[in-house]
Amino acid sequence: MMMRDGNISGPKKKKFTTKCRPFSFYKNRHIIMLINDESVYLYNLTLKPPSYYISSIVGQFYKQDNSTKNAQQLVLVSSTTLQLFEINEEAGKLELQSSQNLLGIINSIEKICLSEVDGVVITSDSGNLSILQYDNKTKKFISKIQEPMTKNGWGRNYVGENLAIDPENRCILVAAMEKNKLFYKIESNSSGSKELSSPLEAHSKQVLCLKIVALNTDHNNPLFGALELTPEKKCIINYYELDQGLNHVVKKKPNSSNSDPLPNDVNYLIPLPGHIGGMVVCGTNWCFYDKLDGPRIYLPLPRRNGQTQDSIIVNHVTHVLKKKKFFILLQNALGDLFKLTVDYDFDKEIIKNISITYFDTIPPALSLNIFKNGFLFANVLNNDKLLYQFEKLGDDLTEGELVINSSDYESLNSVRESVTSFKLKGLDNLALIDVLETLSPITDSKIIDSKLVTLSSHSYVKSITHGVPTTTLVESPLPITPTDIFTTKLSLESANDEYLVISSSLSSKTLVLSIGEVVEDVEDSEFVLDQPTIAVQQVGIASVVQIYSNGIKHVRTVNGNKKTTDWFPPAGITITHATTNNQQVLIALSNLSVVYFEIDATDDQLIEYQDRLEIATTITAMAIQENISEKSPFAIIGCSDETIQVVSLQEHNCLEIKSLQALSANSSSLKMLKSSGKETHVHIGMENGVYARIKIDTINGNLSNSRVKYIGSKPVSLSVIKFSNEIEGILAISSAPWISYLYRDSFKITPLLEIDITNGSSFISEDIGGEGIVGIKDNNLIIFSVGKEDSVFDPSQDLTIATTKLRYTPRKMITNGNRLFISESEYNVQGPFKCNINGDVKENVDEDYYEAFGYEWKQNSWASCIQVVDSKSNQVIQSLQLDGNESIVSMSAVSFNKTSTPSVPASHLVVGVCTNQTILPNSYDKSYLYTFKIGKKHLQLVHKTELDHIPQVLENFQDKLLVASGNHIRLYDIGQKQLLKKSTTIIDFSTNINKIIPQTNRIIICDSHKSSIVFAKFDESQNQFVPFADDVMKRQITSIMNLDIDTLIGGDKFGNIFVTRIDEDISKQADDDWTILKTQDGILNSCPYKLQNLIEFHIGDIITSFNLGCLNLAGTESVIYTGLQGTIGLLIPLVSKSEVELLFNLQLYMQQSQNNLVGKDHLKLRSYYNPIKNVIDGDLLERFLEFDISLKIEISRKLNKSVNDIEKKLIDLRNRSAF
């Protein structure tokens, strides 16, 4: 794949294309496919699913094995993904149990009781009402019920907009925003499983349904409360009752005593538990309790002391205690939590009082969930999700704290006139214990040194790196230069490693250290210390063997005394390699012989097998299965002829070669490991830096199903490490250390970050809290653990996120050498910082306070700044706060009278701002261009230029500043006091230019309304841009990038990705025969020539950025895209015809075989707005890896391929550019 940057011109234009023969037909089992050599074929993969979770629910979705407690789990659902988490109470962490791409767009989700466990009810764009249940065997949700409700897609009459389930699981209500409401009764069939009856309709004409909640009726008919809007724009409350006896729906209105008109600022409904019933209706600074046959009870909502912000409830969670007691936590839009309690008279069945108190302040959330074991999960809006633990319930109020009682208020007017305020405080009742890192929303991204740097999560720069963090525990120098390191325990029953053995082949020495509270020399080890050690192993019950160059030292502990036995090779022969486990020892001699020993279980004696194996070539590595209770049936021997041999160690054919496997290079290290009690794999480190994994049949020793990964330029060294009691893996060290392990039937290989070692070994000690790794680098000993400090290793996470806090919502990021220039603007916010663009200003701002409680809200106000971040240290090195009520709308780095290249960064930074800007309706007072000089350390203001238009787009074009606004494009050059206008162009058929890509002598214009994409060339004779080609399809572009000088990839606001290209002949004519081309007349108020559409694909998220690059070592350059909801995806170019044909046909069979959990047709999903074209959906194809073996074989036979061939192709595709 060859690509050229749009800023580079030349005589030859290379295309972003696949190398296929022209117009070939391929026929396989009645499947015909057309491939064109001018087409682009891409393979889509989702690397990180959306992390904007629209809802979260807590329930008992599966029962834990051997657990008497009814543990609860957490379900998080984004627009396309369903994830299940479990709380590890000992570590206080959320652990991911399952993550599924539903291949549909989720609208809402609720919990439903399915006999012994809970399930989830989902409404989606498929038009089905879906009920899913978690299968603990497959660790996935499976479909139980698919009930068609309406047609596919969205609309005002889509009944899945609102979802409510009766608390006693008797019926489900789904309601459209307009008119339609459907009631499904939940019934049990003869087998005891749940099923849905035919729906009962309850249509409400001429009203809009804003919100519906299910009410508790204490075994009476199911009842639902609805907030609706009349044609007169008045809010009303209606009740809908399902009469189970007559099997129809009755619409009821509040009784006459509750018929007071509702204020139009009503926004939220909260149902109360069963013995009380009814609901709390909330509005701006007020709420009241309403019940169908009871009086209303009014209360004001607390407001922050000394601030003018209103208190608007946006979220709540109800928690029921023992003896029918309960409390409700209300959260307003600022994040303040209020505790609502009800004083209920059970004898008279009336409410005596409702009280509200201030509880705590946490970030504003979309949903809150309380676990029975005392945890609170906050599904935070546009930021990391937070897990809290209850320290107390807020009952011990001190004197002076706010308590609001309903008995003090009689009417809604008295409540609305009342102002009750409280004083903010730090967390008192809650304690933060875990953070679930998310990326939503992503507004921009760049690839820097194989890291994806994003502007995300409200106000952060987040650098995403493929790798697992490490924590260094001990680092100390050694008296020798080590070349190898080993750890061992002294007895079989010992849980901890007790000896640390360091070997040096350079100085022919061995150092034995004891492991405990301190690391010190061992004087009585009985080891040979004047020769380098090859292996150390605890064998039998209480023995240790040391294998060194000239023999084997066997140290036995008998009645507390150490006894030694020596074994020596023949004279002049040395030991070159060794591999051991608790019962077996295998060594290789310099005369190419292999000697095998076993341990006598009765007295720990070392018994030599009488025969020896003679190898024809030099042995480079060897391995037997480690850390097992039984004997290893085979040994693996690597030879210098680039092969590995499988040698039997079984009694009937001991030391017999069973099979052989050719490699791409000599093996430098070998390990054999049984993965999670299932398959056994041979792990191979090669001298060319390739790490391979091959499955071995433990019955006959056959090798199959190989997987390879390039991990560095140096020979690969392997060692077995233990991450936890359940997970063992491999430490692979080349140019950098990597770890590989099997987790939930998925094999992961991930680099270790922030550590540099040349050799390592597993290390278990209570003094470091469990499992760790001890390594060597130069003359230093390093002990470290895998995972972040004070946290356990999470095998489900192979991405590390480094964060840098910003002030406001980041909008755009520009790279300049090692610095990032970031523009930030936030609406309806009053910033506490003073303007300092003309120089430093002394100020004392408590940033911790604003981090906890947020900035003060102010209507139609803006807070904006520019921050400079060092991309290496992730530190903010300069902050420039803008003056007054200014908002940043655009920013660009410009080289005035100087060519900008990657080695010569731009000289100036230009920022476009508006004053007093408002949104809906859109307006502004004045607009300016700030010009800053980019210095070696800081930005320095040069001058300020006033404009008569909003600077919507700024770009660098031919050493001038290009400014686009509306349908005008202007060029500016730098002056002494302001920027000087040099050119003006009006694009008649454009309306609102929002993106421009500059090239050498032409630009690519994007319009968010009418003309979509336009190619224009700068005509020096006319001193303006002349458009000559545009897109045939009108799109609302959100992001765009050059693939080559003629090819573009873009995304629109509806979640579609497309690739378009200008015809090669037209592009050449624009360069060579411009005089003729520019005189061509346009067609129907557009350009004379049209672009070719090459790719169409629906992602389901609004694309905010594209980057060319890769996220792994020596990977293929691909397109990496980010979505607003936190999606990170990859588009890999497919480079051969056979590959395209295989994947295309596999996709067809997968579409036929795949059972979608929400009932969405895959072709309709990926063709939401335009038919899918030339993109293979890797998210669908990777489900092949999860199929049972019978279905895999059925599909593979249709494709004339083996199952292993298909699996290997899918894994190799992912490894090309990602992980």
Curated annotation (Swiss-Prot):
Compartments in which it is found: Nucleus
GO cellular component: nucleus; spliceosomal complex; U2 snRNP
GO biological process, one term: mRNA splicing, via spliceosome
InterPro entries tied to this protein: Beta-prop_RSE1/DDB1/CPSF1_1st (IPR018846), Cleavage/polyA-sp_fac_asu_C (IPR004871), RSE1/DDB1/CFT1/CPSF1 (IPR050358), WD40/YVTN_repeat-like_dom_sf (IPR015943)
GO molecular function: U2 snRNA binding
Keywords: mRNA processing, mRNA splicing, Nucleus, Spliceosome
Coiled coil location: none
Assembly with partners or alone: Associated with the spliceosome.
Sequence similarity: Belongs to the RSE1 family.
Free-text function comment from the UniProt entry: Involved in pre-mRNA splicing and cell cycle control.
UniProt name for this protein: Pre-mRNA-splicing factor RSE1
UniProt source species: Candida albicans (strain SC5314 / ATCC MYA-2876)
